[in-house]
Amino acid sequence: QKACTMDYFPVCCQIVLGGGAYTAGNPCSCQGFVASKGTCDNPYPCPCTTEAQFPVCCTTQWGLVSATGNCACGCMGGVPVSDGPCPEVY
């Protein structure tokens, strides 16, 4: 159980399972998706810190990507296609 604070110091938040980080507020860290302190290299803040961070399979311009929530999916310009991580590609 992580301690949750509602301050909004930026953290680098991994919103894509296995990679892809976006700058987000501290509530992100409650969900365990923090890559590092401070802002990410990605210049765009992602307001995806208030929803439950359940994996979704998201269709994006890069193909199917497993994201940590519908908001994270939308943050990449994607559309959720199913709950849970995307199936492995063979």
Swiss-Prot record:
GO terms for molecular function: carbohydrate binding. Disulfide bonds join C46-C71. The N-terminus is blocked. Contains seven disulfide bonds. The modification Pyrrolidone carboxylic acid is found at Q1. The keyword Hydrolase does not apply. Keywords: Disulfide bond, Hemagglutinin, Lectin, Pyrrolidone carboxylic acid. Lectin with specificity for complex N-linked glycans and O-linked glycans. Has hemagglutinating activity towards rabbit erythrocytes that is inhibited by N-acetyl-D-galactosamine. This is Lectin-1. It comes from Hypnea cervicornis (Brazilian red alga).
